């Protein structure tokens, strides 16, 4: 619902700047033209076998977590309701960065894994894919996002177990803990946020 002038004053959000935090499972926010708060997160539910479809587009547990994080971030906005919700699948690589490449002797170009700040990434992705399509040598075409494919996810059931274990470990880091053994090993293998 739109914020009242007093609610906006209470949180000191005078402009319409986009806001994000720096956690592994980050939240982001902005004000719409009619002063509604768009509140989102990199939280995503994993469904066995990479399940996608309308039945997976809404995850009540994710919405509950979003409302709780909103209340912690904006305690002065207690009671603000969220009449609109949306969700859906995301594409994440094991490095949590996009990857670009070509198939069929360069006749098919692709970009995938736009996790997190994907909308902002599309501007650079368009330029990068144009350089690949034109076979133009450039700094963009030489990035690791093109040269170094992400490590593949393991097959089920190892995939689900590994995603759950990494998620638990990242939540501990978000809570202030140092990266544990699992995250350190994955980083050394070139898998994860720091790889």
Short names for language-model regions:
Residues 1-5, 10-104, 185-195:
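Active-site substrate-recognition segment that forms the wall
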Residues 38, 109-110:
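General beta-strand recognition
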Residues 89, 114-115:
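Short beta->alpha junction loops/turns
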Residues 104-109, 115-195:
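C-terminal lid/capping helical subdomain adjacent to the catalytic/cofactor pocket in oxidative enzymes
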């Amino acid at each position: 619902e739109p914020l009242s002038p007093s609610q906006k004053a209470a949180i000191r959000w005078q402009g319409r700047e986009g806001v994000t935090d720096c956690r592994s499972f980050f939240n982001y926010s902005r004000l719409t033209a009619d002063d509604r708060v768009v509140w989102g997160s990199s939280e995503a539910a994993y469904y066995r076998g990479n399940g996608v479809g309308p039945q997976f587009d809404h995850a009540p547990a994710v919405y509950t977590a979003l409302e709780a994080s909103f209340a912690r971030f904006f305690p002065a906005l207690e009671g603000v309701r969220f009449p609109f919700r949306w969700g859906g699948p995301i594409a994440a690589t094991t490095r949590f960065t996009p990857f670009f490449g070509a198939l069929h002797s360069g006749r098919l170009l692709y970009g995938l894994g736009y996790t997190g700040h994907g909308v902002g990434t599309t501007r650079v992705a368009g330029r990068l894919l144009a350089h690949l399509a034109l076979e133009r040598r450039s700094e963009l075409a030489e990035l690791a996002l093109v040269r170094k494919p992400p490590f593949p996810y393991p097959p089920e059931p190892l995939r689900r177990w590994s995603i759950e274990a990494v998620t638990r470990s990242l939540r501990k880091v978000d809570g202030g803990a140092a990266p544990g053994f699992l995250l350190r090993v994955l980083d050394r293998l070139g898998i994860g946020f720091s790889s």
